[in-house]
Structure formats: structure tokens, C-alpha cells
Amino acid sequence: MNGFRKLLYKIPSNLVTIETLVKEANLSNDILANMKKGGLKHIPIFKEKIEIILQQTLSKIDFSKIKGIVIAQSVPFKIDLKLEQKIPITTISGQPCAITHLGIELANEWQKNIKQDILLVAIDKPLSIDKRLYFNSAMGDIILVGVLSNKNVKHKILSSYVDSYIFADNGEYSDIQDINRFRENNPLLIRENIINNLKKIDLELNDIDYIFPHTPYLQIWDIMAKVLNYPREQIFTKYINKTGHLNSNDSFFHYLKAIENGIITKGNKVLLVNNGFGGSRGSTIIEYIGGQK
């Protein structure tokens, strides 16, 4: 059985209102109103440099058992893991808001091949205030760290699936026609990603107890509930008012927080899905096994 022996996150307790962020970025009241309509209220932002927080998070990992490291970043920036041991490191980037799923796919296959523990580090930060605020949404800070193993697995990875078809390749500066094409096709492409992932392991959508999605705003998941014919209350977005979106890592935070709050129980099968603007998508299906952290 392969999966996460340990999966943990570090999210700031410092919550900044979207009013403060919109004012700092000199954005309009219309944009603020759209953010509120999408369910956003506060965004978690580290007061310290995220690299310092990363070191604190990594201090909880026993590196003597780690034989490989995958670093997943949508927008790459230099980080120093300050390792005492020599451990092979692979860094992947791109696929904004979906890269963590590719990191899991890579790390899981690596673990299966060498039968040794692999560390996944998923970390992103906005390089400026205008990069934090994006298309009526706002990005919060988080660090996700997981140890993939075939021993003492707590979160069994059943399947991962990543795909891309890029409609708008320059973000909010893309041609308006490309942006509109992306928005028209996005719900169906998210559904296709989910269905293809389920097919890999011969599951149906009704086998999934909860969907934990990317959370730029609520409206996309109101639509997806209808597109998937899946209960909206089982598409878990209740924490969005204190997270906004967390790049590729928000679905994992929502999942782990739901475990902490007793919503997810042993044996539950969940689907975590991230849809990036422009045309990248990733999803991971997990069975919660429970056990030691």
C-alpha cells in the first residue's frame, strides 16, 4: 500500500482582510464586491519569510529515512532545504494551481520504484501584491509537506491524474477571446479530469464521499455540482472565508482540516481537485486510513 505516512501543513494564523489587500493593490470596489460574492473574507499571510517557516516545518521530518525529495512550485523561487544529508532533489514547476498533484504523481512513482520514503514539498508564494490578487480571487500562504511511503500509510493514494489544454497562456493578460474560451470549457474539462481519474481505478463518482476542491471562489463549484450531478454539500468549500485559494495546496488543506474536525473518518474515499486558470488540472484520490501522524 502506497501513500502518505505523514502529511502536514503550515498555514499562517495572521489573517488579512480582503478589504486591506484590495486597498493596498489599488483595485476597485467592484473587484472587492466580486471577491465577497465569491465567499472571500480573510487571507492567511505569513509575517515571516516563507523560507523561515519552511525550515520550522521540515524540522518535524526524520530525514534519515528520506531517499528522495520532490519540490513542487507553480512559480519557482530559490529555496534552501539546509539538508545535512545528501539526498537527490527534483524540482518541478508550472501548471499554476495544479502542480502539487503532478508532484504527488512523480513522488509516488519514485517511491514505488525504489521502495524507500520520498518527501514532497509543495510551496508557493506570490512575488507581489498583484500576483496575490488575481481574477476576483486572492491567494493565501501555505506550506504542504508529505512523506510518501509503503509503510504505516495514513493517507492511501488510490490514483492521481494531471492534464492540460491551455486556452489562455498569459494569465489575466491573455486575449479576452482566449479567456472566454477557457471559461466556457473549464467545467467540462474539470469533469473530464475527474472521470478519467476515477476510471484508472474502476471507481464511480458515487464511491467518493467528499470532493475537496481548489477554492478561488464559490461559484465554480456551484456549477460543478450540477455538471457532475454530485451533491453540493459534499463539495467541501466551507473554509474559503479564511483561506481564499492556496495555489495548488488548498484542496489538501481543506482535506486535512476536515480530518482534524472529525468530518472525514477512516475508510472515507475523497477526491482532491485543482483547476488552474488557463487550462491545467490535477486531481488525487485518497482513502483515509488513519493511524499515527
Regions found by a protein language model. Give the residues of each.
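Condensing-enzyme catalytic core mediating Claisen C-C bond formation in acyl metabolism
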Residues: M1-P44, D130-L188, E192, N196, ...
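Short beta-strand segments
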Residues: R5, A72, L119-D124, L272-N275
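Acidic/glycine-enriched edge-of-secondary-structure segments
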Residues: G38-I52, I92-S93, R181-R183, G244
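Membrane-interface helix-loop-helix junctions at boundaries between adjacent transmembrane segments
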Residues: I114-D117, D130
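Short, well-ordered, mixed-charge alpha-helical segments that flank or form enzyme active sites
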Residues: K78-I79, A98-H101, P126-D130, I166-D169
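Stable alpha-helical structural segments in soluble proteins, enriched in small hydrophobic residues
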Residues: F46-D62, I99, G103, A107, ...
